[in-house]
Amino acid sequence: MRAACVILLASLTVSVSPGGQAQALPGEGDPSLDELLQLLRSMLTQMEDENHANGEQTEWLEKRQHPGKREEDGGRLRRQHPGKRLSLEQVMLEEPSEQSELSKRQHPGKRYLMLLHKRQHPGRRELQEASLAKRQHPGKRLCEDWSETGCDPASVLLELLDRSGAEEKRQHPGKRLELEDDLTEQE
């Protein structure tokens, strides 16, 4: 709107200024200042009426919105963190105490077997630590099923002692063959 007014005023000053006038049509006199002001007022009121008709559109164009807080259909929809995306139905169905616990990230090495529903004194957490399952590296698993014959506690301890004495360094798979060949040649 301001730009249109500036253009209109600039054109009026050019047309009224001496030397800037074009040849007038025959039968037309020079417009008086009152006529020019009346023309200007009518044009401005016409522009205001057009702006009121397109008022919603101009407000939408003028007001920039944050991409995560766009207003659609009167309600505000917010984007969520990709790791915490839950549908509205899921959030409403869950209990409030579980919502706070489920939304928290956990250490990758520990998986909750059951949710802890309330915070406890730090000294009492050790009792609950037994309910947490510690993840082990797949190559380092000793016994997955303790009912097997080789998985009694005594044999596991003996195996650990044997491993600790002969610590082997992991090597590139292609180099292992060369070392095995060297060992067989030395014998």
Curated annotation (Swiss-Prot):
InterPro entries to which the protein is assigned, alphabetical: TRH (IPR008857)
One record GO biological process: hormone-mediated signaling pathway
Organism of derivation: Cyprinus carpio
UniProt GO molecular function: thyrotropin-releasing hormone activity
Pfam families: TRH
Family: Belongs to the TRH family.
Signal sequence extent: 1-22
GO (cellular component) term, any one: extracellular region
Record gene name: trh
Basic and acidic residues bias: start-end ranges: 60-76, 164-178
Residue ranges of the region described as Disordered: 49-148, 164-187
Residue positions where Pyrrolidone carboxylic acid is found in the record: 65, 80, 106, 120, 136, 171
Residue stretches of biased makeup (Basic residues): 105-122
Function in brief: Functions as a regulator of the biosynthesis of TSH in the anterior pituitary gland and as a neurotransmitter/ neuromodulator in the central and peripheral nervous systems.
UniProt keyword annotations, A-Z: Amidation, Cleavage on pair of basic residues, Hormone, Pyrrolidone carboxylic acid, Repeat, Secreted, Signal
Annotated localization: Secreted
Chain positions found as Proline amide: 67, 82, 108, 122, 138, 173
Protein name per the record: Pro-thyrotropin-releasing hormone
Domain of life the protein comes from: Eukaryota
